[in-house]
C-alpha cells in the first residue's frame, strides 16, 4: 500500500508537485530509504547541473526520486526528480551521451535492458537539489 509523504524532511523535499500537479507517493519501504538518505541533511538551492565525474553512486528511491552521491564530498547528496518520473529506473541500466562533463536538467537518459540490450524507455533529469549534512546535528 502506498502512502502520501508526511515525514520530515522528506515532506519538505517533496512538498511540491512532481509534474502536472500530482503528489509523489512512496511505499513505506521507499519512504524509509529516503528518510535514511536525508537524515541530518538540509536542502540547498537547486542546481541545473552537477559534475558527472564526481558522482560515486546513484540510488533509485522510486520512479520519481533519484539520489546521486558525491565522490569528493560525502556530506552532500543530490536529489533529482525526473519530470514525469523515470519508469523502470530501478530495473534497467541508465545510458546517456557524454557531451559534457556534467549531468544536467533536461538531459535524456535511455533505459536499457541488461539481457537483451533493447531500449526500454527514456526519461529526462530534473534539477538537482543538494542536501548537505549539518555537522552540528547529532554531534552533541
Where are these regions (language model features)?
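Positively charged n-region of N-terminal signal peptides that target proteins for export
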Residues: 1-4
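Bacterial N-terminal signal peptides
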Residues: 7-15
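Residues that line or immediately flank small-molecule/substrate-binding pockets and catalytic motifs
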Residues: 8, 62, 132
Amino acid at each position: 500500500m502506498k502512502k502520501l509523504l508526511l515525514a520530515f524532511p522528506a515532506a519538505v523535499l517533496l512538498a511540491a508537485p512532481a509534474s502536472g500537479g500530482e503528489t509523489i507517493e512512496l511505499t513505506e519501504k521507499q519512504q524509509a530509504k529516503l528518510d535514511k538518505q536525508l537524515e541530518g541533511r538540509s536542502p540547498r538551492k537547486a542546481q541545473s547541473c552537477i559534475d558527472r565525474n564526481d558522482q560515486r553512486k546513484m540510488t533509485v528511491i522510486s520512479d520519481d526520486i533519484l539520489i546521486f552521491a558525491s565522490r569528493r564530498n560525502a556530506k552532500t547528496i543530490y536529489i533529482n526528480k525526473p519530470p514525469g518520473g523515470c519508469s523502470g529506473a530501478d530495473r534497467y541500466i541508465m545510458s546517456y551521451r557524454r557531451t559534457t562533463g556534467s549531468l544536467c536538467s533536461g538531459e535524456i537518459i535511455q533505459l536499457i535492458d541488461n539481457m537483451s540490450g533493447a531500449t526500454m524507455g527514456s526519461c529526462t533529469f530534473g534539477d538537482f537539489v543538494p542536501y548537505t549534512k549539518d555537522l552540528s546535528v547529532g554531534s552533541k
